[in-house]
Amino acid sequence: MMGSVELNLRETELCLGLPGGDTVAPVTGNKRGFSETVDLKLNLNNEPANKEGSTTHDVVTFDSKEKSACPKDPAKPPAKAQVVGWPPVRSYRKNVMVSCQKSSGGPEAAAFVKVSMDGAPYLRKIDLRMYKSYDELSNALSNMFSSFTMGKHGGEEGMIDFMNERKLMDLVNSWDYVPSYEDKDGDWMLVGDVPWPMFVDTCKRLRLMKGSDAIGLAPRAMEKCKSRA
């Protein structure tokens, strides 16, 4: 009886320190302590972060490999030069068209020449290939310049006999205006000294000059005709 009371008094006895400090804390089995639990959680949080970092690094590495493996975009073709004018026909095409036209026997090019008359304040331009003879040219000039009349003193195709000096001088003196032309040599000659096709090819311009001024051309025309003969 006394022993049990002493034990109870001992348990309820006040003393300095935490109660039960002299007793060994019983083992709590397999439960973890607070500090162990915190350390474990920290370790678990670090492991996924490391895994994510490694995954991101792998992804970046893979992307860089893909970019290096992919070919670069092909270079864009240079912009074409803007065509000026319409239709856009270049010079070499024009030359090809002209050569093809000549080879195919197309129409001949026009032979435009300027026509002037002494005392007339204006000029005319005609296409010699529109006419077939000197007579047709004379009629056309008569319509252009009413003051000009060309008599039919010539022979075949309206050609003038430049080999006969007397007839030539009579012809020049009988006309108020005499048709003359500048040939490729730069010499002024009387119209009708050569056959018509040759005249069309050699004539550069026409001039209806006064008969008194054309007298000086007669000897020169005779000399040139003799040299051609």
Curated annotation (Swiss-Prot):
Q: Does the keyword Cell membrane apply?
A: no
* Effect recorded for residue 88 to L: In axr3-1; gain of function. Affects auxin-related developmental processes. Affects photomorphogenesis
Impact when changing residue 183 to A: No effect on interaction with ARF7. Loss of interaction with ARF7
Sorted alphabetically, the keyword list is: Auxin signaling pathway, Nucleus, Phosphoprotein, Repressor, Transcription, Transcription regulation
Induction text = By auxin.
User: InterPro entries annotated for this entry?
Assistant: AUX/IAA_dom, AUX_IAA, PB1-like
Mutating residue 89 to G leads to what result?
In axr3-3; gain of function. Affects auxin-related developmental processes. Affects photomorphogenesis
Q: Does the keyword Cell membrane apply?
A: no
The UniProt family comment states: Belongs to the Aux/IAA family.
A further note on this protein reads:
Increased auxin response of mutants axr3-1 and axr3-3 may result from an increased stability of AXR3.
Which PANTHER family does the entry mention? AUXIN-RESPONSIVE PROTEIN IAA17
Anything noted about its domains? The N-terminal half of the protein contains two conserved domains I and II. Domain I includes a slightly degenerated ERF-associated amphiphilic repression (EAR) motif which seems to be involved in the activity of transcriptional repression. Domain II is required for the correct degradation of the protein through the SCF-mediated ubiquitin-proteasome pathway. Interactions between Aux/IAA proteins and auxin response factors (ARFs) occur through their C-terminal dimerization domains III and IV.
Q: What quaternary arrangement does the UniProt entry report?
A: Homodimers and heterodimers. Interacts with the auxin response factors ARF1 and IAA24. Interacts with IAA1. Interacts with TPL. Interacts (via PB1 domain) with ARF7 (via PB1 domain).
Know the name of this protein?
Auxin-responsive protein IAA17
